[in-house]
Amino acid sequence: MKILTGTINELLNEVKAENNTNNSLQVESEVKSIIEKVKKDGDQALFDFTSQFDGVRLTELRVQTADIQSASSKVDPAFLVALQQAKANIESFHSKQKQHAFLDSEKDGVIRGQLIRPLETVGIYVPGGTAAYPSSVLMNVLPAKIAGVKRIVMITPPAENGINPHVLAAAQLAGVDEIYQVGGAHGIAALAHGTESIPKVDKIVGPGNIYVATAKREVFGLVDIDMIAGPSEIVVLADENANPAFIASDLLSQAEHDILARAILITTSKKIAEETQNEINKQLENLPRKAIAQKSIETQGKIIIAANTQEMFDIMNEIAPEHLEVQLENPMNYLNQIKNAGSIFLGSYASEPLGDYFAGPNHVLPTSGTAKFFSPLGVEDFTKRSAFISYTKEALAKEKDAIVLLAKKEGLDAHAKAIQIRFEEEN
């Protein structure tokens, strides 16, 4: 893991050099072909692609209700308790995000307002196959339920022995309405276009590999999506009082995700930089996913020694990380200096996995610098706003001349006429 020093511009160039997503033309071409086949052949294309990509020959796509209900009996009861605790925290946090309708009548004869309506049908993508991500089920489904989405459709790739019971148990607990054992770009295509079995949805959310991300980009506009997620990333800000073992473990918690994951420490202390580097090498030896984490640390990892605290925040805000840990003395004092970050962890005991699984804020976060303009997944992502207005004749009469003037200045005479015609009988 490189230790970097230099001017702020030199340091930014170092970290920006890796800040790109793999958007190969070959993947895009393959995904377009997959989408077209699903549009043309429907369910049969899903059976074919599931056999080709997952090595599983399906006879039906929908997971039966009995299989979902029996999943809880196949998992450790302690897991179910932990899942219920996480669910309570996620619901508690996200329920505070609910937007509200409003109505005002500040002028005589004028009523204006806003309606908040949930989306009708949402598709949730949950990575699957050999891996299991029940936390992803909760983080994507629960905000949609709180928003009032009527139909939640989940898709996840199958393994040879079906779908992981931990994922099914999480789906039942969260309140998923339908589950289909299909994944990849073909699963995204099915949600966007609909097939004989899978309904077309209004929005698709959830993480996935580059094929899933590319497919989401391709269908955006036909349906809404949450975001295009890149590899996971973390930036830790640390002063001379931080614990190098804590820092190293948190950096590795992201590095083990993916060889392209980015783990960056920014510190004002050379001693902390060197001790953290040693801790990373030490802790790597005991990781089951050592090969992935080590490759990530070697190719994407950085330790930056900043000149001062302000420079730490300047560099971090330019990176706009998915996860930001502030391991500084009195971390709450620095909240105002944070402009661009997906999720923020304050203090030595707010470790990033706390947010991944349990604390309540969402773990579906903007990556690759998009925290400059995107937000974490939330309840508002599953709602839409409509405005309404009502004017009496007397209220419109007071403002008609201004409206007509504006319309004519834009050369839209029919707009002007639509106002004028309502008062012609008086002339």
UniProtKB/Swiss-Prot annotation:
Cofactor note: Binds 1 zinc ion per subunit.
Protein residues bound to substrate: S232, Q254, H257, H323, D356, E410, H415
Pfam entry (one): Histidinol_dh
Keywords, sorted A to Z: Amino-acid biosynthesis, Histidine biosynthesis, Metal-binding, NAD, Oxidoreductase, Zinc
Residues where Zn(2+) binds: Q254, H257, D356, H415
GO molecular function: histidinol dehydrogenase activity; NAD binding; zinc ion binding
Role played: Catalyzes the sequential NAD-dependent oxidations of L-histidinol to L-histidinaldehyde and then to L-histidine.
GO biological process, one term: L-histidine biosynthetic process
UniProt cross-references to Gene3D superfamilies, sorted A to Z: 1.20.5.1300, Nitrogenase molybdenum iron protein domain
HAMAP family: HisD
GO CC, alphabetical: cytoplasm; cytosol
Family: Belongs to the histidinol dehydrogenase family.
Superkingdom classification of source: Bacteria
Enzyme Commission number(s): 1.1.1.23
Protein's pathway: Amino-acid biosynthesis; L-histidine biosynthesis; L-histidine from 5-phospho-alpha-D-ribose 1-diphosphate: step 9/9
Catalyzed reactions: L-histidinol + 2 NAD(+) + H2O = L-histidine + 2 NADH + 3 H(+)
Protein name according to UniProt: Histidinol dehydrogenase
SUPFAM superfamilies recorded: ALDH-like
InterPro entries attached to this UniProt entry: Ald_DH/histidinol_DH, Histidinol_DH_CS, Histidinol_DH_monofunct, Hstdl_DH
Cofactor(s) for this UniProt protein: Zn(2+)
